[in-house]
Design a protein with these regions (language model features):
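Short, solvent-exposed loop/turn segments enriched in Ser/Thr/Gly
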Residues: 35-41, 130-136
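Asparagine-centered strand-capping/turn motif at beta-strand->loop junctions
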Residues: 44-49, 139-143
């Protein structure tokens, strides 16, 4: 009996730790809102070759070497496909006293794959009347059946690529028929973080489907450039006037073509 089980046990020893090593928390960041709510935001990387679900982030907070508070949160999408990322926003509303440091770990289960057919087809930053920032865009269902409970999650980054906030929304209505497209708006509610945001990435999923693979790296560079220009122009509108003046000047255009 032992001889029959030993190959299985050896396989178990080498495969399960490997799966856990390929799923990890990355790029986490802690901040406190104006109302005192503590946030820890970050990404969950799945570098394994299997989809995972029931992904949970567990946090332990310490003071003077003693654990003083435990809490947990779930990944904001129901599944993370191989070579894809998840996002989490762990919040602590109550006062937990002075904290020296915290630790995070992640737990998950191997899942059945979902079709990757929910696609973000367009997106852009917008600025509201009271200087609040939002992301608006369109999401498409490239599947063969209706997608229900469609949601879009935004991971927001600073200039150095660090995660600084997470936000999400459901489409309205929250279903999307096959080969149809819907509009979405993701508000960036925390103004303390809005000042440092220069880039974002988006994930979308439904109960039936998950997101198509992310944009290639080059698209991210374009997003950074676009947002930097957006911020510069909103802070210095005269740049627009000068730019339009140059474009309406034939001599200036010809000098740039030589």
């Amino acid at each position: 009996m032992l001889k029959r089980l030993s190959p299985f046990l050896i396989l178990l020893v080498f495969t399960i730790p490997g799966a856990f090593a390929d799923v990890y928390i990355d790029n986490e960041y802690k901040y406190i809102e104006n109302d005192g709510t503590l946030h820890i935001v970050g990404e969950i990387i799945n570098e394994s070759n299997k989809p995972i679900n029931q992904v949970e982030v567990n946090a332990v907070f310490y003071h003077d070497g003693n654990a003083v508070y435990h809490t947990s949160t779930e990944n904001l999408t129901s599944i993370i496909m191989p070579e894809m990322k998840g996002a989490f926003d762990l919040t602590v509303i109550e006062y937990i006293g002075d904290i020296d440091h915290y630790t995070l770990d992640v737990s998950f289960k191997i899942a059945q794959p979902k079709e990757q057919v929910i696609e973000i087809t367009s997106s852009e930053f917008t600025q509201g009347p009271v200087d609040n920032i939002s992301i608006q865009g369109t999401v498409a269902n490239n599947g063969e059946i209706t997608a229900n409970m469609v949601k879009v999650i935004a991971t927001l980054y600073d200039r150095d690529g660090n995660v600084v906030a997470i936000s999400q929304t459901n489409t309205k209505p929250d279903y999307l028929r096959a080969n149809d497209e819907s509009f979405f708006v993701i508000p960036i509610m925390d103004k303390t973080q809005a000042d440092v945001i220069v880039d974002y990435s988006l994930l979308a999923e439904s109960e039936e489907y998950t997101a198509v693979p992310e944009f290639p790296l080059g698209s991210g560079v374009l997003l950074v450039a676009s947002l930097s220009a957006y911020i510069a122009l909103t802070k210095n509108p005269s740049m627009i006037t000068r730019g339009l003046g140059y474009l309406s000047n034939p001599k200036w255009i010809l000098s740039r073509l030589r």
